[in-house]
Amino acid sequence: GCGKSTLFSLMTKNLRPDGGRILLRGQDIAGMKLREFARQAAIVHQYNTAPADLSVEKLVGYGRTPYHTMGLSPDPAADEEKIRWALGITNTEKLRDKPVAELSGGQKQRVWIAMALAQDTKVLFLDEPTTYLDIRYQLQILRLIRRLNREFGITIIMVLHDINQSLYYSDEIVAMQGGRIRAQGLPEQIITPELVRSVYDVELEIREVDGKPFVIPV
């Protein structure tokens, strides 16, 4: 691979860097305890599993765990408010009593995002949030992600395979190849036929859609 999964694991404390530092709000994450990190950044991994009988509301409630001590909440009312908000913003409140195992792929992804939102962080990491989803659910997830950023000021850091989705829904992109960053910046500034050819080894034509670059095979 190009190295994006490794970079994602480094940024989310699943791997330790061999050298250098990774800073979150000016603080080296290597020195953060997991609880401290979880109060600042939430993560939705590409593959997620839950017990078959676990309800949506219970799963989303686990997002409050970083604020609990010995399994007890210091403020149950605040927990309930955050859970209710997370269910509402992801349009999953009607699913709250359903077992997670009974949900569709798109519903499950929104529920996992709801759990991350219940953590009440300013940074949200997403690893391939649209993988294996039908295009309708992909668009629902991407529009939700954009809304979280635009309306609620949450910084979104996500790994995407689809180049056009990356270009359209991102304010800044990082193109990687061979474990190194090839380019980084605004989509419209860094995406060129030469870059695409060198990274993807294909010939593409670049057009503009809503002010964003859109690539088409030629």
What are these regions (language model features)?
Residues G61, P76-L95, D120:
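Conserved ABC ATPase "signature" region
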Residues I173-L186:
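H-loop (His-switch) and adjacent beta-strand-loop-beta switch element
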Residues L124-E128:
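Catalytic Walker B motif of ABC-type/P-loop ATPase nucleotide-binding domains
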Residues P99-L103, Q107:
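Conserved ABC ATPase signature
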Residues S198-V218:
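ABC ATPase nucleotide-binding domains
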Residues G20-D28, F37:
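Conserved ABC transporter NBD signature motif
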